[in-house]
A protein has these predicted regions:
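Active-site loop/oxyanion-hole signature of alpha/beta-hydrolase fold enzymes
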Residues: 21, 70-112, 116, 292
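Alpha/beta-hydrolase
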Residues: 169-253
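Conserved HGGG/HGGXW glycine-rich cap/lid loop of the alpha/beta-hydrolase fold
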Residues: 29-78
Length: 306
């Protein structure tokens, strides 16, 4: 994996703070074209939305792009771990949606989410919906109709990821030290050029003691989300979702090295495609192909909404 490219995330056009029901704060960042249709973008467990810049930078010419990091990730301050779980991620969507409308004007919002943010958005949309439509990249879901072997696989690997997160290093002497670990990891071998450095800058902050860098999301918080993941993966009720949904998966034929892909092709109720030759981190591996996979659905939703 060559790493010559450097991605520099631009300064947001505007920022705002959304305060959750328990007092947790989530920073909203606006990029792109304020007069365009609105996309709301978030990330997977332990990451941050800025790490997805190779993907969302392709959308800023036309779309009004609003980013947010899940609570206790990325730009957000770290709060209590007691409320850091998928259930609060689900509840946060409604508050975040209202804060976006209040601070950046009220217009239809298409949610574009990945992994656990996709999982939580789907569960949220089965109760109410802050979004007019959802594009979900490789959501961690095992809805009725999934193959039993997929359910068993997700249960096993989420447990392994949770245990591994508890053993993660929390501090690094430099960004380069973190990047070296990423480059050695089998799960990150398909990343696009420059992505490891971008991940480092998005998921680390200067250490509180002034010595090197530390994880933005504490490892215990990341582990909790993975360990409780199987229960929430089965909680998604696709029959009750209140808005159009497009699911874009990673390649179910590629041996997984980060998180297993659930093969949703046989669930006929879904608008489902996958991006060939990708793993769970597909938006950081083939960003242009991921945009191409979602655009016909987004265009239809924009036409209907506007």
């Amino acid at each position: 994996m060559s790493q010559p490219k450097r991605w520099d995330v631009p300064k947001p056009l505007a920022t705002a703070e959304a305060r959750m029901a328990d007092g947790s704060r989530i920073v909203l960042r606006r990029h792109g074209n304020p007069r365009g249709p609105r996309l709301v973008i978030s990330h997977c467990n332990g990451f941050a939305a800025d790490a997805y810049y190779p993907f969302w930078s392709l959308l800023t010419d036309r779309f009004d792009v609003v980013l947010f990091d899940l609570r206790n990730h990325g730009w957000n301050p770290v709060g209590s771990g007691e409320d850091h779980h998928v259930g609060t991620f689900v509840e946060d969507h409604a508050t975040i949606g209202r804060a976006i409308d209040r601070n950046f004007s009220d217009k239809p919002k298409i949610g574009v989410f990945h992994s656990v943010s996709a999982q939580s958005a789907l569960i949220h949309a089965s109760r109410e919906s802050a979004y007019s439509a959802l594009v979900l990249f490789d959501p961690v879901v095992c809805p009725p109709g999934c193959r039993p072997e997929d359910v068993e696989k997700v249960d096993k690997v989420l447990g392994q990821l949770g245990q591994a997160a508890l053993k993660r290093r929390e501090r690094f002497a430099s960004l380069e030290e973190f990047m070296e670990r990423v480059l050695r990891s089998p799960g990150f071998q398909l990343l696009c050029p420059g992505a490891p450095e971008l991940i480092a800058r998005a998921t680390l902050r200067p250490a509180s003691n002034g010595d090197g860098y530390e994880l933005c999301c504490p490892r215990e918080y990341e582990a909790r989300v993975s360990l409780e993941g199987p229960r929430w993966a089965r909680a998604a009720d696709l029959s009750r979702v209140s808005c159009p949904v497009k699911i874009v998966g990673s390649d179910p034929t590629v041996p997984f090295s980060f998180l297993p892909t659930v093969d949703l092709r046989e669930i006929l109720a879904l608008d489902y495609d996958f991006v060939p030759d990708t793993t769970h981190l597909l938006q950081l591996e083939q960003p242009a192909e991921c945009v191409a996979a979602m655009m016909p659905f987004v265009e239809r939703c924009v036409t209907e909404a506007f």
